[in-house]
Amino acid sequence: MGMAFMLLACTLSGCIETGNSGGTTDDSPVDSPTWDVGDWWLYTFSTPDYSDDTARLVVASDTEEDGTAYMLAISSIGEARRHAVLNHNPFLGRITHENLSAFENGAPQPVLDFPLSEGASWDFTLFSTEWSASVRSVSGGVAVMEAGASDGSTLDYVYDASSKFFSSFIWTDPSGVVQLRMLLADDGSSHSGDVYFVRGGDLYSNTWDESGPDFEFEDSFFVSDHPNDGEWDEMIYFLDAACGSGGSSITLTLRDHGSISALERVWGPGASESGTLGTIPYPSEEYTLTATFTGDSYLRLIFAGGITQSWSL
């Protein structure tokens, strides 16, 4: 597996030698880059929920945190909302100038620790997990890194100085399931257009996998403000649903504190949908969720609050 990853790293970074390369390599430490507003990276993301989902990350600002951090936004409002509700891309939002550190729970986390030199090691927290990282190799401005957690989870990632960011980033859980795979498809500068970042906060999630007699479920949740930024602009929901044949069905209703319906959905026999995103504007106070299931039926729901920022480049 290690040899396969090294081959992937070299292929992505273009470090396989040709007959004209002269066989020389440069193993000098890799320094921290400087990003400019408008720099962009096109990544393909794969998760257990999505396969080969493409997103363009764009530097929207370089003056965050009193001039010590960038703002890394996304060129699609839909993708920005998906991040807010699923939180599968840790490299959106504030990124520090010094180490390109992503923020988690309000603190910068040094996934990279510049200068990157072979054998260097450090610790950080990401995905609510503590990691011990090290640099496996450095060659031609490409640094190959690995990180491990106490539960057996691993991170394998490659930084390429020519693109000034990751060429690959892979998170594997203890059972061997890849929870996140980021592969760089393209990069450039001077992006033009609107870019977005949606600051999210978890509100409610549940999964039902039912079979047999009719079943009705009712629950409620309270929409509190963001701890720092106040009221949410919108509530973002994500859902998967599937009904078996015969008499299988699902009915879903979400009502606010005034009993006004905010979301209503019905699925009949054989109906299904996957990865649906939607929004409910200006959520407030308490919501009541009611779901009825008949026969073989599956429903997964996630709700998050969202506050949208946008920039025109």
Q: What residues fall within each predicted segment?
A:
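Acidic, serine/threonine-rich low-complexity disordered tracts
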Residues: 23-81, 99-209
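Noncatalytic modules at the cell exterior or secretory-pathway interfaces
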Residues: 278-297
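Edge beta-strands of jelly-roll/beta-sandwich modules across compartments, strongly enriched
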Residues: 248-250, 295-309
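Non-catalytic, beta-strand-enriched accessory regions in extracellular/secretory proteins
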Residues: 205-231
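Beta-sandwich interaction modules
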Residues: 221, 254, 266-284
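Short, surface-exposed beta-strand/strand-loop-strand elements in extracellular ectodomains
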Residues: 245-263
